[in-house]
Structure formats: C-alpha cells, structure tokens
C-alpha cells in the first residue's frame, strides 16, 4: 500500500465519516415547499410552519392536540378501543399486518385521537386524525372514537373541535368503514339540535369519505393555508372529465374564494382565534390569550452533507 494512500486518503475518509456522524439524526429538516434547510428546534418554535415560505407541514394528531389545548386537565377518550380485522381482508398484504405496521410506526392504536380538556380555560373536546396511520383512513374505531368525543360534548354541553387529515374511508373495512360516514354525521346532527358548536379544521390533506361526512359538517369550517381538500384527487378528476382543472383547485384558498369553507387560519393563530370564536358561539367572556415567551435559539451552521 502506497504512503499516499495511508497518509492522505484514509485519514481524509475517516475525517469525513466523523463529520457525518457528528450531526444528530433529525436535527435538520428540508422544507418540502421552498427547500430551505431548517434547524429542527427552531422549526418546533413555529409549530412546524416554515419561517421562510409559511408552508404548513404535516404534523401528528398528538402534536396538534398538544399545541391546541391547555396543558392541564386533559383526558383521552376511547383509548381502550383497538381495530379488529373482522373481514379477514387481504389485498397485497393482510389487513392485520398493515395494522401492526401502522401501530409500530406511529405508536397509535388507530388513526384518530380524541381528548377532553380546556382551550384558554374553556371546556372543549378535541379529535385529531393521525395521517401517518394508514393515511388517516376512517374505520370502525375512528368512527367510534369520534362519536364518543361528540357524546362527551353532548353530556357536558361543551364545544367540539376536529382536526381532519385523511384520505377517506378505510377500504380494508369495506361497508363497515362506509357506515362511519352515516354514524359520525348522525351524532353531529344531534350536536346541532342541542345548539352545541362543532368547529371543523381542515388540514392537509382531507379527501374521500371524511370530506364527504364529518369534515364538511362544521358550524364553522376552517382551513389551514394551502391545505388540499376534496373528494377525489385532482388527477382522478382530470382523467374522468378530460379537462384541465383551474390553478390551485382543491387548495383551501380556492375553496374559501368559492364559499366552501369559512376561514383560513394560520396554525400559529388557531388557539387565540378559535378561542375567541368559541367564546362568541357559547356566550362566554372573551378569553385572554398570553403567548408563551419565545426563547432565543442559536442556529448552528448548516452542515455541508445535509
């Protein structure tokens, strides 16, 4: 082996490997919209909204609930419920194996988390879809957890808020999943009859049986900026009607312009704005919102290998 190989090349490779390993996993994140490389702790301060282009990144169900509800007094509803493969469904993979994989990936039993708590001191119940669990698809457990949350709102006469992020009904549960559309719609009709507010927040994306049922039944329907909202996807529609769709079709801004939703609210403003809205709808005093102090973060230089 030549002296050049021993003295120059091998130490250079070793230094490169040391540099790579010194960057902790997940410390940097690339924005899918503007491709800016963002420091993860700084991104968490902005609630996963890109500080460069305002792109609202997808976040999990528990993260949504955590940034929305007050820290104290939370109780999860329907946590004991688990999905069952009653139909022994199999496509390219057994449904029960898909469930196990999704549960391992997300740490959740199914694609909806429901929790009671307070928003700026006001009692409220919240449901949030976990899109990483089989695309946030709605099956029997998702439907039952939503109904339990709505029943809690009925029993305690408190408002309900739902954050939707779903591809629609879960095909592996066939008619059982389609039945959840009627089941969730029926319980929301009871809320309306009792005069209990239901606010639906549409996040990216909301499609299929969820958009055709509970997601579009809010007394007030709110969209996050640039969220994709529809029944079938744009490509499916274009192939069916054989026409080019308008620019931005199915984005929340397009839906707001055409009267399909009521508001678009930045994720960082959801707590105070929905708090004020719920206070008006329930006749309660306007709550005081005190923003948490923002601690300065020293952002290190972006590593060359990121």
UniProtKB/Swiss-Prot annotation:
Its EC number is 2.1.3.15. The keyword Cytoplasm applies. Component of the acetyl coenzyme A carboxylase (ACC) complex. Biotin carboxylase (BC) catalyzes the carboxylation of biotin on its carrier protein (BCCP) and then the CO(2) group is transferred by the transcarboxylase to acetyl-CoA to form malonyl-CoA. It is an enzyme of class 2 (transferase). This is Acetyl-coenzyme A carboxylase carboxyl transferase subunit beta. It comes from the Bacteria. One of its GO terms (biological process) is malonyl-CoA biosynthetic process. A zinc finger (C4-type) spans 31-53. It comes from Pseudomonas fluorescens (strain Pf0-1). Binds 1 zinc ion per subunit. The keyword Zinc applies. Its cofactor is Zn(2+). It is found in: Cytoplasm. Acetyl-CoA carboxylase is a heterohexamer composed of biotin carboxyl carrier protein (AccB), biotin carboxylase (AccC) and two subunits each of ACCase subunit alpha (AccA) and ACCase subunit beta (AccD). Zn(2+) binds at residues 31, 34, 50, 53. Belongs to the AccD/PCCB family. Pathway: Lipid metabolism; malonyl-CoA biosynthesis; malonyl-CoA from acetyl-CoA: step 1/1. It catalyses: N(6)-carboxybiotinyl-L-lysyl-[protein] + acetyl-CoA = N(6)-biotinyl-L-lysyl-[protein] + malonyl-CoA. GO terms for molecular function: acetyl-CoA carboxylase activity; ATP binding; carboxyl- or carbamoyltransferase activity; zinc ion binding. Residues 27-296 form the CoA carboxyltransferase N-terminal domain. Keywords: ATP-binding, Cytoplasm, Fatty acid biosynthesis, Fatty acid metabolism, Lipid biosynthesis, Lipid metabolism, Metal-binding, Nucleotide-binding, Transferase, Zinc, Zinc-finger. One of its GO terms (cellular component) is acetate CoA-transferase complex.
